[in-house]
């Protein structure tokens, strides 16, 4: 995150500050492009500005300027006859793309979400998550309200997309083949668990999550031909944790949670694990100071949106010790994440 030393460090710093301000504008451009469903409209090839304006109910002149900005950001390409076509980045904003990143692009720029980032200063001063300051309720309560369904759908899509984006980093950084039965706690529709079971064909799994994902989980696992290998348990994490697994996985769960709640869940997992010497808790999360600099920046999302945080090694050691675990090893997985391998402590 720091510029390379040059003969003109102040100029380099100024260039980076300017670029950060431009990047913020690019995020808004991509948000507008996605919300107008322009990538979906361009999926079959170039279309004119007039055609796109009619399809989206937009002012042609202003739409042209948005399209031009999107081309400047490499999401679209400007072609002859006042027309535009998808570039590879824009293609990833299509709703039906198998590796779409539309949800994360729209969710974080939604006005209700973006407004919370505007309260960052007050959040730092008060110690209260900025989202809660802005909306007078926690993020997940807000998302559960029927009037916020569109934002909730974008959030859910963003979580799936993050999982897709980072899955290979996790799967190639750690030997999951050591285990035979996985419990994926808070595993959503089962996307990561499916990747693990595909990589380890002899293994089985238990997917644990809340009622909101039940239908999508069963549908997704069926699409991956994994129905016979995965047991789906729907309910409160504290009530439905399975016993008898040799790997308990928490992927991106504890970063959302304050320490007290995290310890409660970890204690419950420790009870479910029992005393099998080879059983492991695998926490897929950031370790500040041992993973890349980007993890420090992404911790801003935790600061603004929820009660959790990206923790340091010392914080992880303390948190896990309070629940009866110690860390066997930390396996970096790309620039942000790591697999934190934990075992139960004796006694």
Curated annotation (Swiss-Prot):
GO terms (BP aspect): antibiotic biosynthetic process; methylation
Class in the EC hierarchy, top level: transferase
Protein's UniProt keywords contain Phosphoprotein: no
Gene knockout outcome: Inactivation of the gene leads to a strain that synthesizes AF but not MAF or RoF.
Catalytic reactions on record: 8-amino-8-demethylriboflavin + 2 S-adenosyl-L-methionine = roseoflavin + 2 S-adenosyl-L-homocysteine + 2 H(+)
pH dependence: Optimum pH is 8.8.
Residues binding S-adenosyl-L-methionine: 209, 235-237
Organism superkingdom: Bacteria
RNA-binding in keyword set: no
Molecular-function GO terms, alphabetical: O-methyltransferase activity; protein dimerization activity
EC code(s) of this entry: 2.1.1.343
Comment on activity versus temperature: Optimum temperature is 52 degrees Celsius.
Similarity comment text for this entry: Belongs to the class I-like SAM-binding methyltransferase superfamily. Cation-independent O-methyltransferase family.
PANTHER family: O-METHYLTRANSFERASE CICE, PUTATIVE (AFU_ORTHOLOGUE AFUA_4G14580)-RELATED
Protein name: 8-amino-8-demethylriboflavin N,N-dimethyltransferase
Species of the source: Streptomyces davaonensis (strain DSM 101723 / JCM 4913 / KCC S-0913 / 768)
Gene: rosA
């Amino acid at each position: 995150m720091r510029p390379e030393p040059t003969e003109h460090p102040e100029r380099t710093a100024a260039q980076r500050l300017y670029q950060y301000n431009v990047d913020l504008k690019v995020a808004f451009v991509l948000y507008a492009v996605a919300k107008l469903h322009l990538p979906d409209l361009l999926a079959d090839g170039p279309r004119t500005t007039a055609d796109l304006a009619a399809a989206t109910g937009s002012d042609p002149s202003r739409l042209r300027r948005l399209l031009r900005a999107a081309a400047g950001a490499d999401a679209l390409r400007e072609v002859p006859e006042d027309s535009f076509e998808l570039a590879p980045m824009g293609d990833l904003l299509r709703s039906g793309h198998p590796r779409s990143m539309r949800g994360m692009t729209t969710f974080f720029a939604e006005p209700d979400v973006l407004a919370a980032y505007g309260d960052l200063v007050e959040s730092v001063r008060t110690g209260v998550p900025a989202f809660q300051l802005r909306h007078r309720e926690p993020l997940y309560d807000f998302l559960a309200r029927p009037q916020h369904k569109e934002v909730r759908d974008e959030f859910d899509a963003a979580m799936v997309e993050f999982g897709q984006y980072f899955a290979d980093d996790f799967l190639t950084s750690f030997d999951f083949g050591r285990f035979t039965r996985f419990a994926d706690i808070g595993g959503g529709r089962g996307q990561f668990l499916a990747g693990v079971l595909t990589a380890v064909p002899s293994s089985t799994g238990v997917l644990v999550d809340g009622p909101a994902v039940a239908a999508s989980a069963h549908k997704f696992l069926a699409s991956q031909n994994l129905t016979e290998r995965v047991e789906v348990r729907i309910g409160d994490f504290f009530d439905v944790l399975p016993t008898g697994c040799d790997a308990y996985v928490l992927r991106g769960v504890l970063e959302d949670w304050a320490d007290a709640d995290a310890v409660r869940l970890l204690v419950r997992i420790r009870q479910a694990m029992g005393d099998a010497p080879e059983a492991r808790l695998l926490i897929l999360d950031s370790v500040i100071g041992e993973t890349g600099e980007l993890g420090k920046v992404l911790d801003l999302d935790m600061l603004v949106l929820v009660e959790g945080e990206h923790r340091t090694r010392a914080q992880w050691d303390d948190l896990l010790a309070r629940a009866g675990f110690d860390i066997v090893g930390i396996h970096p997985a790309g620039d942000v994440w790591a697999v934190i391998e934990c075992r139960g402590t004796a006694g």
